[in-house]
Amino acid sequence: MLAAFISRVLRRVAQKSARRVLVASRNSSNDATFEIKKCDLYLLEEGPPVTTVLTRAEGLKYYRMMLTVRRMELKADQLYKQKFIRGFCHLCDGQEACCVGLEAGINPSDHVITSYRAHGVCYTRGLSVRSILAELTGRRGGCAKGKGGSMHMYTKNFYGGNGIVGAQGPLGAGIALACKYKGNDEICLTLYGDGAANQGQIAEAFNMAALWKLPCVFICENNLYGMGTSTERAAASPDYYKRGNFIPGLKVDGMDVLCVREATKFAANYCRSGKGPILMELQTYRYHGHSMSDPGVSYRTREEIQEVRSKRDPIIILQDRMVNSKLATVEELKEIGAEVRKEIDDAAQFATTDPEPHLEELGHHIYSSDSSFEVRGANPWIKFKSVS
């Protein structure tokens, strides 16, 4: 179904000019300049640029990454319904421009922490599809050895996946404090949703980050619904980019990977200059419900979802740009689609056949190093044994 959808889209792109993309100029055979939406600003005299250059290599990379995240999430949906995945599972299809654009705007040595809707960020931070799907199915080959599941995945310079709404806010500020304490040039992206924006601990993190001028980019992924509650019903002020009060803010088109990239570069440079934290609101949209137990159509209409798919889909926006600026051909994008499909299928095969972890694995990685003391007379390294 997805393959047919993409094929129709690519044929349409090839037959007529892009509706949503303005090509400012064509520099060479390997890059093109595009106009992007201007960001709304708060406590800032100037913001990110309104034009940006996209190279062919960058465009192909972003397209592959966004398509991989989309298909990975759809495969996770399938595996959940087949009962290979149990427990909580929050999908981010529709929000691919956020995770890909954010990663494109920072360095690998920078740090990222996010909420439980973490699969896309896990992938863009460097985890393989195989290790992500295997973690979802609770297998040994998962990035957390099958013990973390959907909400608790980790890799180098990525700190999860956090199950408590808004809890990553203070943690992100703490990571930024470590960066400042060490005196390096690194920053921390701290992501949270529009629902978490109403949590008190987010405001507390704002306060300490501003007080100590921490290199922290607070990022509100506003997908318009906190679980099943719209932003208009939950927030006295839905202008989340102004919620920092004394922290400058940007409102960004979160459905445009280039807009997210340029805004992230701007915010990262702001933090690296020693000015303290900055707040970004990414206006985005999730196609699935809040979680797998939420059909996602009781508080919004199917027509609303379809309108976003047809007019603002982040993958289609990039496809339009690539094809109409001749940075890529329809055939090239189809080939990438076939390669991504195979990668996802192979990863799913691994995730459903790899062995589950041994029971005693539950007792591992509780302490960072061997404990030289006893806790209330108990040996903390006693292996868990089956009661059967």
From Swiss-Prot:
Family matches, as CDD domains: TPP_E1_PDC_ADC_BCADC (cd02000)
Tissue: Testis. Expressed in postmeiotic spermatogenic cells.
Function: The pyruvate dehydrogenase complex catalyzes the overall conversion of pyruvate to acetyl-CoA and CO(2), and thereby links the glycolytic pathway to the tricarboxylic cycle.
Disorder: Spermatogenic failure 70: An autosomal recessive male infertility disorder characterized by azoospermia, sperm immotility or necrozoospermia. Hypospermatogenesis and meiotic arrest have also been observed.
Residues holding thiamine diphosphate: Y116, R117, G163, V165, D194, G195, A196, N223, H290
SUPFAM superfamilies cross-referenced by the UniProt entry: Thiamin diphosphate-binding fold (THDP-binding)
Name of the molecule in the record: Pyruvate dehydrogenase E1 component subunit alpha, testis-specific form, mitochondrial
Top-level taxon: Eukaryota
Protein location: Mitochondrion matrix
Record PTM text: Phosphorylation at Ser-291, Ser-293 and Ser-298 by PDK family kinases inactivates the enzyme; for this phosphorylation at a single site is sufficient. Phosphorylation at Ser-293 interferes with access to active site, and thereby inactivates the enzyme. Dephosphorylation at all three sites, i.e. at Ser-291, Ser-293 and Ser-298, is required for reactivation.
Transit peptide: 1-27
Quaternary structure, from the entry: Heterotetramer of two PDHA2 and two PDHB subunits. The heterotetramer interacts with DLAT, and is part of the multimeric pyruvate dehydrogenase complex that contains multiple copies of pyruvate dehydrogenase (E1), dihydrolipoamide acetyltransferase (DLAT, E2) and lipoamide dehydrogenase (DLD, E3). These subunits are bound to an inner core composed of about 48 DLAT and 12 PDHX molecules.
Protein source organism: Homo sapiens
Mechanisms controlling activity: Pyruvate dehydrogenase activity is inhibited by phosphorylation of PDHA2; it is reactivated by dephosphorylation.
Phosphoserine modifications at: S291, S293, S298
